[in-house]
Amino acid sequence: MGPAIHNQLYECGLKTTSQDGFLMDNYETQLFQSLNRFINFINNANQSASNKEQNTKFCKSSSNFLRLKLLTVLRQWCDSSRSNCTLEVRDVLTQWWVTLLNFLNSDTSLQIDTALELSLSIELTSVCLECLSKIMTILIILPFHSSRDMEIYSHHLLLTIHCITNKLILISKNSKKLKRTNSDDKCSINDKKLQYLNKYSSLLRAFIGKLNAYAFFYLPEDFHFDTILLLTVSPQISSSIQTSLFSWKKRQYKFTDDQGQMIRTEAFENKDTKFFKIIVSYIKNDFVLMSFYWHYWYIILQFMKFSDSDVGIKKSTLSCIPGSEILLTHVTTRFLNSDLNKFTRIIKQTPNPRIANENVTESHPNFKSLNSSNALITSERINDYVFSNFKTIKLWECLRSLSGCILKENHPEYLENMLSLHESLLIDYVSTISAYDYIAANVIYNKVLQFIIFQFESLPSLKFIQWRSWYNGLLSMLRTKNVNCQTVSLLCLFNIWKHVTIEDRDEIVKVLLSDFWESLIFENEFPLIRILFMKVLVFKIIPSVQNSSSLRFLPHDRIKQLYEELLVNKEELFEMQKHDSNDIVAHRKNALVFNGNSRLMMIPKKPNTEDHLVYKINHDKNLTTERFPSVSSVANTRPNVILKNGKYAYDILDEMTSKAAFLLAEKKTRLNPKKNHKIMDGYEGGQENEDNDEDSEDSGSHKNKRKEGNSSLSATLNTWLSKFSSTSEDSQKKKEQANELGNDFEYDEDVADFAEILPKQSSSNIEKIFKHGNNSGSMVSYNSSIKLNRRENILIGPPELRFSNEIKEHNSIATIFKLVFIQTNRRVVEKIDLANMKWGTIHGGSKYMKPLPVPKDLVASVAKNESETRNLATLCGNGLDFEIPVPDFNIFGKCMEDEQDVAKIGNQNVEDLKVTGGREVTIWKQIQDMKLRTRIQKICVLIETFNATVREYFEFSNRLEHDGIFIDFEVRKPSSNNSINIKV
């Protein structure tokens, strides 16, 4: 490579590649020269590479030549958002396409009798496949291309399919042969060969999805490739002739139940179609399907960008987009239906801990450890299962990556319509589920919907979620008055509140404070519902209505009405003291406690970073801990990236990218060992137990302050500045990994033609820098010990890594409410028993417990105490003001209170009521007295809960923003671990 050209690459590597700043036309001559040199090199090398050492040098030299001469140019082109190139450039890229296919076809490493030492390296194969993939993208056929371009492109696409399919056949056949071989002396050789075949197969699978997508659109219709693929997805389809967005595609597909109209493969089956079925069959793999789906919509959106047709992306025009109706239904309705069915089966298989251990209850702090032998499906395992296995989760992560690519190219006009179409089909299916099915609702609203928000909140310009449809479902669950359904609804409202539009928020506030006020605070007997509703009111509703002229005073008036009603009934409240003076006061310390010993504790959230997870998975292959233990753990994480061990999931990339990603993750993890050690299920400094005393609870929460500031190493993988050197501070393992990466650019002294472009290795150490610029994303590689002609060798990084990389750094959750267990006080149990006796409730005591008569002296004692209390009331009057809870109105700020008349409930004066019959009057009086006591008790509890929640809010607002908080716990069946709901 000449100095001028080399400097040109260096400049492109460090500057932002604008849409017009990079021209492939400038590299036409360079690409032709590189092509000729590569052909000469591989022809000469085939004669000399006769041993392992020479073959290794050949593979490394070939890999580096392709990286620096071809792959760098292709990556720059794909990153420049250009969609057209000259005929000459198309010709040279087509020649490269044929050459790479011939090079891969000439490889005999997949033959069972080929020595492993003489096989092409996996790394060289990955470089070739990425070059092929990039060429396919650059040469994509769009509306302005000629029919000649279409024919050439289609022909080479067919050659690629044959090449990849033949390799898949060889891998499958030889793998079976090797597994059947039981000879001990060949065992180690066979194992190595099998490992090689598995790695090769993994590379091909990463490319198959994209290859299927391009073949779906660009192979001639006579091959019926699109029909074969759609039949693999769903066999119950029919076809008809109709005009399409793609002028050369005439067939429209739709679902049918008519056996006579269904497509039969026998009608068009031939030698080619049988061959296509092999590569199409891989669509059944989730990752291959998502890769196909990514490129399927990429081709459509690119085509629409330059099309003169009026076809848009909406339900009424799906017939003009080939296969869209079939594929959309499959990945939305069928995916979610399959996910929920599998999830329900798993939940139903959960053993009942009460049967396994009668002496341990679910609220026991050590419940998990005491019942570990029962293999309970914990909340952590459920969340990990959902985010690891749900196809719906994979779908929306795929759409998020595609959105990042399309927005980079500055044509989002059809993108929102495409996303809205997927969301509307999802809503259509959700609307068919009963509002009483809280298990499905919890998965959909608190996992799937929340995951969609997490994925797209880093792209605020995209507004495609139809909030009105979602909150209509939430309100339907509130109307059921089922505790589990209401819990799911309130949880979702709290967590999604900041993302809902202002208009929809106001509508929700009106409905909650008008239609559901009495239902949620008085008619509901579950403390959890009261606590969650108060959290929604204090943390979300009150701050959001401060600027609303019509709703500003509504929450204030509601709380004020409660307090005034309490004041009116103050005398009756005093009369209640003679029965149990602690009934009301006890709620001040336990206002936020539910299920006896459970509480939602506010603690800082420590991000469970992708880099840390990638390092753990690659460092420990037998890792058994959950990768996604909670919903908040995926707030800044891409599950598919983790499941692919840090690799890009939707296309084939050079293996060096994976090595660099792992080394970067390791470096970040090792530089923050203390912080990473503190990460436990995504939380930092959480407490498992706390005292019943309120002061200890407050002090415990203050100890869990969130550590401010983030390390500079939390920058994305697209800003790599990772320097690997062998210093005295590095461990031996780090040296070996750095040397391994350094050897990727090892210099072959026997090939003089490549000496000018391959950096040499220093005898003392290796200093390599792989660098992605903040804007250009360019990956730089140079040897600092020996600089060739004082120029650096540049390798541009793959632009795919930036498509969804913002998710890693977009940490929208700073604090969470986590379920914790508090120490159970024996007095609480006694109070529960007293309350049960007082109201005549039959509780689940020992089956041998016999009710005993009350002693006569105890009856006399109670009567005497009542008389003394009545006399004391006469003397002291209303001197018990300290017993009445007063709402904390400070949260409303300087709210101008409306002096409106509040409907007041006065004491019922029984003497003024003219009711005949002494016994009837007495019974009626007792009933009214009990009603009033119950009402007053509920108001006191509500005010205490409100005040306790306000204290939490002030503690939170003093440190962080109002919308950076998240409630993170699981709604489970009452017989399962970590349950937050009980059935009465």
From Swiss-Prot:
Disruption phenotype: Cells are viable and do not display any phenotype.
InterPro entries the record matches: UPF0592
Transmembrane segments: none
Protein's UniProt name: UPF0592 protein YDL073W
Family: Belongs to the UPF0592 family.
Residue ranges with Acidic residues bias: 687-698
Species: Saccharomyces cerevisiae (strain ATCC 204508 / S288c)
Any Gene Ontology biological process: osmosensory signaling pathway via Sho1 osmosensor
Region entry Disordered, spans: 675-712
Domain of life: Eukaryota
One annotated GO molecular function: MAP-kinase scaffold activity
